Amino acid sequence: MAMKRKKISVIGAGFTGATTAFLLAQKELGDVVLVDIPQLENPTKGKALDMLEASPVLGFDANIIGTSDYADTADSDIVVITAGIARKPGMSRDDLVTTNQKIMKQVTKEVVKYSPNCYIIVLTNPVDAMTYTVFQESGFPKNRVIGQSGVLDTARFRTFVAEELNISVKDVTGFVLGGHGDDMVPLVRYSYAGGIPLEKLIPKDRLDAIVERTRKGGGEIVNLLGNGSAYYAPAASLVEMVEAILKDQRRILPAIAYLEGEYGYEGIYLGVPTILGGNGIEKVIELELTEEEKAALAKSVESVKNVMRMLE
């Protein structure tokens, strides 16, 4: 029997979706299908063709197509959802919830119809609530519907720590718990540089400032760009998760997982440390938390629940 390449579909061909597609192809993780709405079919095809034409120069073998027809996504191994509207001036987060929830429902129906055995990774904001929507709509088991926020939040944290210490980002590990918002909980106690606890290397006031900057990391970029939000680091974070699943790496990565009692929470999607491998979320790792960390997590959960109350 011929070996088949893996197939990854990316829903939403905006900056994040297109960047994700390009990185996936470059890493030769599989053939890539980039999907957007019919009104944007030509630009989507154009982006895909442009990427494909980079393949001889960069030396990667992956087919990339752009489409608005979900039939082209049939039998995907992984589907990444980046579709949705971004917040515009004058819009409340509530507006975002209602519109993006509708989009998630439509997208999920199509995804499930053509790829009933796929794994789904959701990036669309507010991501905790949108991942929950996709989970409900898909009827998939919890290990196959995953949200991305922690890899990105942790990457930001690691970047700021490496800058502070003037060292390689490769030597910094960190963990961010909770919702993807201003109440996220970077766990400094479980963060290291070259195996040395950060608390031994960075004074408390500087660490606190790094934590605060991490929480506001997305907003910092939104303000600098003036139009739109981050896409390079979010795309890179998605690719790391896709790779962990497709290669069954069993990586310990923060991901938005469905909790059934872990950390004392039930029936909610939340950012937690997980083992990510060939079966998607294979395990939620429960860390011992201090009272202060538990309180911070509870506040983060409350923020997520407030958004979830807006779901139809």
Swiss-Prot record:
Transmembrane segments: none annotated. GO terms for molecular function: L-lactate dehydrogenase activity; L-malate dehydrogenase (NAD+) activity. It is an enzyme of class 1 (oxidoreductase). Catalyzes the reversible oxidation of malate to oxaloacetate. NAD(+) binds at G12, A13, G14, F15, T16, G17, D36, N100, L123, T124, N125. Its EC number is 1.1.1.37. The modification Phosphoserine is found at S149. PANTHER family: L-2-HYDROXYCARBOXYLATE DEHYDROGENASE (NAD(P)(+)) (PTHR43128), L-LACTATE DEHYDROGENASE (PTHR43128:SF16). The active site is at H180. InterPro entries: L-lactate/malate_DH (IPR001557), Lactate/malate_DH_C (IPR022383), Lactate/malate_DH_N (IPR001236), Lactate_DH/Glyco_Ohase_4_C (IPR015955), Malate_DH_type3 (IPR011275), NAD(P)-bd_dom_sf (IPR036291). The lineage of its organism: Bacteria, Bacillati, Bacillota, Bacilli, Bacillales. This is Malate dehydrogenase. Keywords: NAD, Oxidoreductase, Phosphoprotein, Tricarboxylic acid cycle. GO terms for biological process: lactate metabolic process; tricarboxylic acid cycle. Belongs to the LDH/MDH superfamily. MDH type 3 family.
